């Protein structure tokens, strides 16, 4: 019996979903409701890549060796420290006759579910990857389940650019939804105050898209918070935020002060897009009572967020960005095409890698 969520691929421990499993069966033979992808490139999530790079002191050979070891041992790419993975692009090799995904052999696709639940085998030893960038050129195969999500790659964008955007496409979609709800609520209540939005890590991939999405959804004032002057200058030049503030997101008072100074008030919506731990308290402190904090970082601690909000007597709603919102891929790609500032930041990041 083949499960639509991939239970039949779980090797150990029995009875858990693929994401929670220690090891998956990555046999290339597919069931009638599965799809096999010939993989051409992985995108490791930022928190996972940072942890690996720091662990090995930037030694690319050691990073590459550990990624290979994780995949061969676990049958998937899931960093055992961060618990996170990433996503991939490739070409459909075979689609089972009962697969509901609508994919056909030859389609070039981006997988929009995490590598942490995707059976994966690497066949080239990652020979073309130097271990120094989040994007990993490779050869191998991956298995999609009936409940997986994939998008056909757009013909007008370079695959590497599409991969970078689709890796974080859940962030702008959820930001857009939350900001639009706040704007609509104030309109219904006759509240003339503009909705203010702070994006922590505003110059990064998810951050830049979230700033663009917030503005499009009706935010009255936005601030992007970045840790270093180079990112401040890049985000200012991109023109995606009404203000750009320099602050360490791990410094709660410093972050809160930077946000409230830039906005004139605490943020109604704070979006956390940084890939380092310890940013929860600052995000809560920077958010107005009745506001919302959206955590998109894989480095977020539930305990730190929940207990921190309680300890600050902060009446805020906290959301975990789960990476999926209906229409998320189309929205992110449309923002990339429509916003030169977003595209410029993405292309500069890819060039630096």
Where are these regions (language model features)?
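Adenosine-nucleotide cofactor-binding segment
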Residues: 215-277
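Conserved class I S-adenosyl-L-methionine
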Residues: 194-201
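NAD(P)H dinucleotide-binding glycine-rich loop of Rossmann-like/cofactor-binding domains
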Residues: 86, 109-186
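Glycine-rich NAD(P) Rossmann-fold beta1-alpha1 loop
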Residues: 169, 201-208, 212
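C-terminal capping/lid region of NAD(P)-dependent oxidoreductase domains
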Residues: 264, 334-353
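Residues in the short beta-alpha loop(s) of Rossmann-like NAD(P)-binding domains
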Residues: 203, 227-230, 299, 324
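Glycine-rich beta-strand-centered segment in the early N-terminal region that forms part
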Residues: 28-43, 55-115
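Glycine-rich phosphate-binding loop and adjacent beta-alpha segment
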Residues: 274-339
């Amino acid at each position: 019996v083949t499960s639509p969520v991939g239970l039949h691929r779980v090797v150990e421990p029995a009875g858990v979903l693929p994401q929670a499993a220690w090891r998956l069966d990555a046999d290339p033979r597919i069931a009638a409701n599965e799809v096999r992808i010939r993989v051409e490139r992985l995108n490791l999530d930022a928190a996972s890549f940072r942890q690996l790079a720091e662990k090995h002191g930037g030694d690319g050979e050691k990073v590459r060796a550990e990624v290979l070891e994780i995949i061969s041992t676990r049958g998937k790419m899931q960093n055992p420290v961060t618990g996170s993975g990433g996503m991939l692009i490739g070409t459909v090799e075979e689609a089972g006759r009962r697969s509901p995904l609508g994919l056909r052999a030859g389609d070039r696709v981006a997988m929009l579910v995490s590598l942490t639940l995707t059976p994966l085998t690497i066949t080239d030893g990652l020979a073309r990857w130097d271990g120094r960038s989040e994007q990993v050129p490779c050869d191998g195969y991956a298995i999609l389940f009936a409940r997986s999500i994939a998008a056909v790659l757009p013909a007008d964008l370079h695959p590497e650019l599409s991969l970078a955007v689709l890796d974080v496409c859940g962030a702008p979609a959820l930001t857009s939804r939350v900001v639009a709800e706040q704007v609509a609520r104030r309109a219904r209540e006759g509240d003339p105050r503009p909705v203010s939005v702070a994006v922590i890590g505003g110059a990064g991939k998810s951050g830049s898209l979230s700033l663009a999405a917030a503005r499009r959804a009706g935010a009255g004032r936005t601030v992007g918070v970045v840790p270093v002057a180079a990112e401040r200058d890049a985000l200012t030049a991109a023109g995606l935020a009404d203000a750009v503030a320099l602050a360490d997101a791990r410094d709660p008072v410093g972050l809160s002060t930077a946000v409230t100074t830039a906005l004139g008030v605490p943020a109604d919506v704070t979006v956390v897009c940084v890939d380092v731990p310890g940013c929860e308290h600052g995000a809560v402190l920077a958010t107005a009572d009745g506001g919302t904090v959206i955590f998109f970082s894989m480095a977020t601690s539930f305990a730190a967020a929940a207990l921190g909000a309680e300890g600050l007597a902060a009446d805020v709603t906290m959301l975990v960005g789960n990476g999926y919102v209906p229409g998320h891929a189309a929205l992110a790609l449309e923002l990339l095409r429509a916003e030169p500032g977003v595209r410029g930041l993405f292309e500069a990041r890819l060039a630096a890698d």
